[in-house]
């Protein structure tokens, strides 16, 4: 199907049922016809399962209403075993809290789909599934490919997951995925200057888990089809604000690769195993208060094939059909309060999106909520729109109040044709959207049609045209613009053609509008629009219609709805509740029948208006047609225009008809190619000769066979529309120059007439119009080698020519101003882009059959055309100029290489081939093809085409007849036959006598080739075994008796083999290790995913490298696995089919759960050569105990046992670890354990340790979002380069070209960068796994700014211990090592740490810095000499904590000063013990006894007789402040000494005894006390000493 035919078909198909749709209510979430008592329809062939939260029991069978299950756990257990006709019905009124429904790897079929719905009394309300993000609802999403710059994998919580499921219908459910800590309902939402001051709660973290209400995932390399969601209520899905293309929002369908593309072999495999969607329908549903998307369908990992070459933005039909989603319909839905976009279709082929309502979306796309602008996708959201779709249709939708363009939303439009091809918006209504009505977004948005829409009070503009591509056509819309808005947004700068629109300035004062902004792709062009209440109009609109008062044009413009209906239904367009009648034209309106007959730039046929009225004949202006009949004609064949009488100035309409005396056009032929409204007559009249009183060319009856008809037409009353001096011509009469074509309306005096003008000559130069495609001439080029010719629709903004790639195109020489003058000396201009193999052409389409003469315009005293017009040394490289008829090259010239040298070859070409026989619709092209190296490929050439007065040759039989063969299905081993079919004059015909048939490639090729009967043309074919699935096509040459010939093709489609048409799938099985786990295969059709039966004779065998404990039943394919280990175990299976003996591979996947397993770990783990490893920081002189290791890991489940074994013997808690010990997690009574071999690791290297998209547990990529703010992990990872990323470019990582990091990284540097546009910084962060002293080092040549182009502003590097700065330096010069920083790290890189401390290398960019990126590669190693012994095992402090809380609850006023002071001292000492992680059991007991004694020793205070105690007569007016806790890097070193001393188990010194400044603990370690610390703690010395607590511990608590 051609693009033109396809788009016409789309428009027709999408409009089907419009009258019905408009006449019926379209509630967005209407119940079924059995309102209040709806039940699901089930199929007797399947099983129905019932679930009731109120009346069920999971011990029931679940297969009757009287014995339903209680929980969805039972459904999830059998979900993958659901098959054709099976139903799962949830009882109305049920609530399934903290539950979910995940259906995977199964299918129904066309006759018996799987059904998920409700049963019972609908008055009880839809059954509710509320997953609330619980662990079971979580799954790991992974596209297995880069998807632009977006996040491509992560954990997602989904309430209803449909994964690789076909033929399934889900209906009548309420679905939520709520987070109790998030509260932001749209019904109470409002913008506030302070976040959350309106009572909302929001998690703005970029690392927040993604959530979905319903997710559809295609992942198995096949088509997931026939999925219907109907009558769902999805709300409160509290997903991630930022992530656009994870399963994150209300409803989201997306396709993944089944495997990563890692080699040429996998690339070939992926191209033939495409995960995609077909026939997805989402209807009658409400989606409210979800993040991020409302409804989205089609995002795909296969964008890497679709977008491999954006080209000019056009999308290849075959490409999108293969890799994109097809037959997608989104209809009658209501989306309100989505955090981001309302409804988006992505990578879809011709989807239809209709009767939907969007309301108050983009709730969180603002500067207060979207606080991490570097997160994927950016702070932009539109309403209802496509991304990279082919010919999508959006119609009968309403969009209200897309939010936040004034608060940071970079979009904010109702509609957005984004990076797509052929987008059609029609019959839509937008109101109050915060930015605009329509955006056509950027370079690769091409060929958009926007027609018969209404925009009312969209706030910052109506049309947003930022750098869009060409081919965009905006016509017959009505836009109502208030005081604060405008027609074009301020950023608009690119192409669109505006025709037949009504622009209304809704203010009380005439407005001067900016009608043109920018000139990209030719900028904006206007024709035949109406401008109401404007002080100016576009200069390009020569046919502008102006009006002062809108009430004289439309019945009530501005009165359309200002909000969505609460029900979510569309507003009525007809009937008593019609909401848009204010946009109907009033009687006598200038808009009525004032439109031009538009030829849609994108070939969409015009059928009806905004209200569903048919559009015929000459249309009205604006979006709504009146019922006033238009007598104006329309024609796609004949060009019309006006002639102006030079004397009177009167204008006469003319129609240009091509005929000569010997090649006439009859009245019948003319009338068959013009049309008008229903009820309009059309006829041709001839004016009588004034002198003779006879018709202007009266002939004798003998010479004119139709004279009787003529005479009859002259009888009185024969034609009331004929004027006195006119004769109505009979159908068979040839028309003449000066005849009148007249249209007249029944019952009225309304007429419209055109004088027929003979046109037989076309002159490229004279006919050229800037910005308007000529009726017959076109500027064209090929867009692919040997491909279709396409019209160049963009025009140069400065010169009179069409343009592509900035410099190339077709037009005329001179300036735009010179177009209005005499063009006698003007040349045609033809410029092809050198070297791309895609030629450029002046193209003329023949309006009639006949013979034409092509010549070139001549110029007196000038070089004969064609020639190169620009002086340049082309070094012998040339432009080839060809004359073509359709795709046939008649002749060529290759002598165009020298400036202003006429082409003798082309002159000879025209002399020999300039007289050309054409059929109507043939293309004559003058084609330029410049080879690589031509510096100035611009040609002067000015073609003129004239019909010769020759009778058209009698058509050859190959012209009169068409012959074809129907495509025929064939089966291997069975003969199929097909006959040749002839047509002539539009109908079936017998084969003409003497016709002969033969294959073009000669004789037959044996039994596996088709055989043709030479006399009848019948073709037979018996496919051989090797031709399963083949399409066998042969070219047939048909030779007629008159010597003419034609070619056609005969095609046989051989049925596929079982291997070709079937998928063999094993749904995933989950179970415990040590038990028999079983899975039987499922067979589905590759074409649509429908369930299929197992072909007879199919056998199964284990594939290569099957794991231990696996077996397969040879006959039925059941795989059994008894695994001794946990984890994911895959069993390869080879499936062999009986029909052709072909084998296919499948895989049974088992998620084996060990009875016990590692839960979480603060230490690094890995799998090395198939063995699990845990890395622990110990060495011979820095040991680590078993207890310390076990404290850093958890078991799953939490009650499982964990221990360390050596040679099979369990070690005691105090035993020191050794290499190859085994960390084991086990369950009582099980022989299966989860084991990790212990390995020592005491050195960490940022570069060597770096892992793509892995944070922790030792190294992290972090950032601050404000100066001196809290450090947080960076959630996003660059899609191409190996680094953590925020704000698109910045963060820490390693400097390498891609994610595939090599094993040897010695030549790779660490990399850190920070955004100069925001506060804070980025960090390479290391978390200490144990206490000790570490040495930080960097490479000898580091650090330095890694990129040229620094501008003198600084990137500040710091080495930090927790929040203390150890070293810092400013990097300002590109590629110059910072000696200051390197020396500081060498001097001060030894740092005493406690377990859990942070060492960070940070980068902070100065505002406005260029290239804020440095090379630095930190290495951190424990120093053996200063590594402390084992950390103390934590002791029980619960009793002491309770006693402290008891003391805090006492009131000082009740007790004597002396006893109270003793209590305070004991309480503070006890608090110090609580705060000390190293406190021993003895210290805890001592503190507990002392505090208990102090409580027991409290003495009650006697009653104070003085009710007015006197104030302190000598208060301290200037209390001494605490010393600065962070003096910064300029502080002088101090000796770290203090004036106090302490005794007990903790001493007043630590591993590092020397600090700096007033706080010696800055670099001296956490056990160091400073002078200021000691002085401040003097009052506590005695008690802390008595309690056995060192002074350092007290000081540490105060810090």
UniProtKB/Swiss-Prot annotation:
The chain crosses the membrane at residues 1574-1594. Residues 1494-1568 are annotated as: Disordered. Requires the chaperone LnbY for its proper folding and active expression. Is potently and competitively inhibited by LNB-PUGNAc and LNB-NHAcDNJ in vitro. Optimum pH is 5.4 with LNB-beta-pNP (beta-D-Gal-(1->3)-beta-D-GlcNAc-pNP) as chromogenic substrate. Ca(2+) binds at residues 178-179, 182, 238. Beta-D-galactosyl-(1->3)-N-acetyl-D-glucosamine binds at residues 150, 244-245, 387, 411, 418, 441. Gene3D superfamilies: AF1782-like, Single-stranded right-handed beta-helix, Pectin lyase-like. GO terms for cellular component: plasma membrane. This is Lacto-N-biosidase. It comes from Bifidobacterium longum subsp. longum (strain ATCC 15707 / DSM 20219 / JCM 1217 / NCTC 11818 / E194b).
């Amino acid at each position: 199907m051609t693009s033109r035919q396809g788009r016409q078909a789309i428009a027709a198909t999408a409009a089907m049922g419009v009258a019905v749709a408009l006449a019926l209510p379209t509630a967005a979430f209407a119940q079924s016809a059995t309102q209040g008592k709806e039940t699901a329809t089930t199929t007797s062939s399947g099983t129905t399962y019932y679930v009731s939260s109120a009346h069920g029991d999971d011990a029931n069978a679940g297969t009757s209403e009287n014995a339903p299950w209680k929980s969805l756990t039972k459904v999830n257990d059998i979900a993958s075993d659901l098959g054709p006709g099976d139903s799962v019905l949830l009882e109305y009124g049920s609530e399934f809290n903290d539950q979910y429904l995940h259906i995977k790897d199964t299918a129904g079929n066309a006759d018996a789909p799987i059904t998920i719905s409700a049963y019972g009394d609908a008055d009880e309300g839809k059954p509710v599934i509320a997953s609330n993000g619980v662990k079971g609802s979580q799954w790991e999403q992974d596209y297995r490919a880069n998807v632009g710059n977006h996040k491509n994998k992560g954990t997602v919580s989904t309430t209803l997951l449909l994964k690789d499921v076909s033929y399934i219908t889900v209906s009548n459910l309420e679905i939520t995925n709520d987070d109790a800590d998030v509260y932001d309902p749209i019904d109470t939402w409002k913008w506030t200057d302070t976040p959350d001051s309106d009572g909302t709660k929001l998690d703005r973290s970029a690392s927040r888990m993604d959530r979905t209400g319903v997710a559809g995932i295609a992942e198995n390399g096949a088509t997931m089809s026939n999925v219907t969601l109907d009558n769902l209520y999805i709300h409160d899905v509290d997903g991630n604000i930022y992530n656009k293309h994870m399963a994150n929002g209300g409803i989201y369908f997306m396709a993944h690769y089944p495997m990563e593309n890692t080699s040429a072999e996998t690339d070939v495999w992926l191209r033939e195993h495409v995960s995609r969607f077909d026939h997805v329908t989402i209807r009658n549903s409400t989606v409210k208060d979800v993040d991020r998307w409302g409804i989205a369908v089609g995002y795909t990992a296969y964008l890497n094939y679709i977008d491999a070459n954006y080209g000019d933005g056009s999308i290849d039909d075959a490409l999108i059909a293969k890799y994109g989603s097809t037959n997608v319909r989104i209809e009658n839905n209501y989306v309100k309060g989505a955090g981001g976009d309302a409804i988006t279709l992505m990578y879809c082929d011709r989807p239809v999106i209709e009767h939907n309502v969007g309301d108050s979306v983009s709730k969180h796309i603002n500067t207060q909520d979207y606080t991490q602008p570097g997160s994927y996708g950016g702070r932009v959201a539109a309403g209802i729109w496509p991304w990279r779709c082919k010919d999508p249709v959006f119609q009968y939708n309403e969009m209200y109040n897309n939010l936040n363009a004034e608060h940071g939303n970079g979009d904010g439009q109702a509609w957005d044709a984004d990076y797509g091809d052929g987008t059609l918006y029609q019959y839509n209504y937008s109101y109050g959207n915060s930015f605009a009505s329509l955006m056509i977004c950027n370079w690769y948005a091409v060929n958009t049609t926007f027609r018969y829409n209404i925009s009312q009070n969209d706030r910052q503009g109506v049309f947003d045209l930022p750098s869009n591509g060409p081919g965009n056509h905006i016509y017959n819309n009505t836009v109502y613009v208030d005081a604060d808005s405008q027609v074009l947004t301020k950023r608009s700068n690119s192409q669109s053609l505006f025709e037949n629109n009504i622009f209304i300035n809704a203010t009380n004062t005439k407005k001067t509008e900016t009608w043109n902004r920018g000139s990209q792709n030719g900028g904006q062009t206007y024709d035949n629009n109406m401008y109401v209440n404007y002080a100016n109009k576009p200069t390009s609109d020569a046919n502008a219609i102006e009006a002062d008062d809108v009430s004289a044009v439309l019945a009530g413009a501005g009165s359309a709805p200002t909000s969505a209906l609460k029900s979510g239904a569309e507003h009525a367009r007809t009937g008593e509740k019609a909401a848009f009648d204010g946009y109907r034209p009033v009687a006598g309106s200038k808009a009525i029948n004032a439109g031009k007959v538009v030829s849609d730039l994108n070939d969409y046929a015009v059928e009806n208006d905004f209200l569903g009225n048919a559009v015929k004949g000459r249309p009205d202006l604006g979006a709504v047609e009146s019922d006033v009949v238009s007598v104006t004609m329309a024609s796609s064949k004949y060009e019309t225009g006006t002639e102006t009488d030079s004397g009177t100035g009167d204008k006469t309409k003319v129609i240009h008809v091509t005929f000569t005396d010997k090649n006439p056009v009859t009245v019948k032929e003319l009338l068959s190619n013009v049309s008008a409204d229903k009820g309009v007559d059309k006829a041709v009249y001839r004016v009588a000769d004034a002198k003779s009183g006879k018709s202007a060319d009266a002939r004798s009856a003998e010479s004119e066979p139709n004279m009787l008809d003529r005479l009859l037409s002259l009888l009185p009353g024969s034609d009331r529309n004929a004027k006195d001096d006119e004769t109505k011509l009979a159908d068979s009469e040839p028309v003449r120059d000066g005849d009148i074509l007249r249209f007249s309306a029944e019952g009225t005096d309304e007429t419209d007439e055109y004088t027929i003008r003979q046109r037989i000559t076309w002159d490229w130069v004279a006919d050229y119009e800037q910005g308007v495609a000529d009726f017959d001439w076109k500027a064209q080029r090929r867009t692919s080698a040997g491909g279709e010719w396409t019209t160049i629709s963009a025009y140069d903004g400065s010169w009179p020519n069409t343009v592509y790639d900035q410099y190339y195109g077709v037009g005329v020489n001179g300036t735009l101003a010179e177009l209005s003058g005499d063009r006698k000396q003007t040349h045609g201009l033809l410029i092809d882009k050198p070297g791309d193999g895609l030629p450029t052409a002046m193209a003329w389409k023949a309006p009639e059959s006949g013979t034409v003469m092509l010549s070139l315009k001549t110029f007196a005293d000038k070089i004969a055309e064609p020639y190169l017009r620009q002086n340049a040394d082309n070094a012998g490289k040339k432009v080839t100029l060809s004359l073509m008829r359709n795709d046939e090259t008649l002749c060529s010239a290759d002598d165009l290489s020298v400036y202003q040298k006429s082409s003798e070859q082309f002159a000879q070409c025209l002399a020999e081939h300039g007289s050309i026989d054409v059929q109507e619709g043939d293309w004559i092209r003058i084609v330029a093809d410049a080879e690589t190296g031509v510096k100035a490929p611009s040609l002067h050439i000015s073609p003129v085409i004239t019909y010769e007065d020759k009778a058209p040759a009698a058509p050859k039989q190959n012209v009169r007849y068409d012959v074809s063969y129907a495509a025929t299905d064939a089966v291997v081993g069975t003969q199929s036959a097909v006959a040749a079919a002839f047509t002539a004059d539009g109908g079936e015909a017998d084969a003409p006598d003497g016709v002969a048939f033969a294959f073009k490639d000669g004789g037959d090729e044996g039994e596996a080739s088709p055989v043709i009967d030479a006399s009848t043309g019948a073709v037979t074919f018996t496919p051989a075994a090797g031709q399963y699935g083949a399409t066998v096509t042969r070219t047939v040459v048909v030779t007629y008796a008159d010597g003419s010939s034609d070619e056609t093709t005969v095609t046989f489609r051989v049925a596929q083999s079982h291997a070709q048409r079937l998928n063999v799938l094993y749904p995933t099985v989950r179970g415990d290790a040590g038990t028999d786990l079983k899975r039987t295969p499922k067979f589905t059709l590759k074409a649509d995913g429908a369930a299929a039966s197992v072909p007879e004779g199919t056998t199964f065998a284990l594939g290569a490298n099957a794991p231990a404990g696996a077996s397969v039943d040879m006959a039925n394919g059941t795989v059994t696995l008894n695994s001794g280990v946990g984890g994911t175990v895959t069993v390869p299976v080879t499936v062999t089919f009986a029909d052709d003996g072909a084998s296919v591979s499948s895989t049974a996947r088992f998620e084996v759960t060990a009875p016990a397993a590692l839960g979480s770990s603060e230490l690094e783990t890995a799998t090395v050569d198939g063995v699990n490893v845990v890395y622990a920081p110990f060495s011979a002189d820095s040991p680590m105990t078993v207890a310390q290791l076990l404290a850093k890991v958890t078991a799953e489940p939490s009650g499982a046992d964990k221990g360390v074994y050596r040679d099979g013997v369990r070690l005691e808690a105090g035993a020191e670890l050794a290499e190859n010990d085994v960390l084991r997690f086990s369950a009582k009574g099980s022989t299966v354990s989860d084991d990790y071999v212990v390995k020592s690791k005491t050195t960490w290297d940022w570069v060597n340790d770096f892992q793509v998209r892995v944070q922790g547990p030792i190294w992290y990529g972090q950032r601050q979002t404000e100066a001196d703010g809290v450090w947080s992990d960076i959630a996003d990872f660059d899609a191409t380069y190996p680094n953590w990323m925020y704000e698109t470019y910045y963060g820490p990582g390693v400097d390498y070209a891609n994610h595939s990091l090599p094993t040897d990284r010695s030549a790779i540097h660490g990399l850190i960068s920070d955004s100069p546009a925001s506060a804070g910084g980025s960090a390479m962060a290391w978390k200490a796994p144990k206490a000790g002293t570490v040495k930080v080092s960097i490479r000898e040549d580091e650090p330095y700014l890694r990129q040229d182009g620094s501008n003198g502003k600084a990137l500040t590097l710091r080495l930090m211990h927790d929040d203390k700065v150890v070293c810092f330096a400013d990097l300002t010069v590109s590629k110059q090592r910072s000696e200051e920083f390197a020396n500081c790290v060498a001097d001060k890189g030894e740092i005493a740490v406690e377990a859990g401390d942070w060492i960070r290398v940070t980068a902070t960019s100065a505002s406005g810095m260029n290239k804020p990126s440095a090379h630095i590669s930190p290495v951190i190693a424990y120093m053996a000499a200063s590594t402390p012994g084992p950390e103390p095992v934590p002791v029980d402090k619960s009793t002491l904590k309770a006693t402290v809380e008891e003391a805090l609850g006492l009131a000082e006023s009740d007790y004597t000063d002396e006893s109270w002071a003793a209590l305070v001292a004991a309480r503070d000492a006890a608090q110090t013990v609580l705060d000390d992680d190293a406190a021993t059991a003895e210290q805890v007991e001592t503190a507990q006894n002392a505090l208990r004694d102090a409580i027991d020793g409290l003495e009650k205070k006697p009653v104070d007789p003085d009710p007015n105690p006197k104030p302190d007569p000598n208060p301290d007016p200037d209390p001494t402040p605490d010393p600065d806790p962070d003096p910064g890097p300029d502080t002088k070193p101090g000796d770290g000494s203090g004036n106090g001393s302490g005794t007990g188990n903790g001493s007043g010194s630590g591993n590092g005894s020397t600090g700096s400044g007033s706080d010696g603990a800055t670099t001296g370690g956490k056990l160091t006390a400073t002078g200021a610390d000691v002085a401040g703690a003097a009052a506590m010395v005695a008690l802390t000493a008595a309690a056995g607590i060192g002074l350092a511990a007290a000081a540490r608590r105060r810090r």
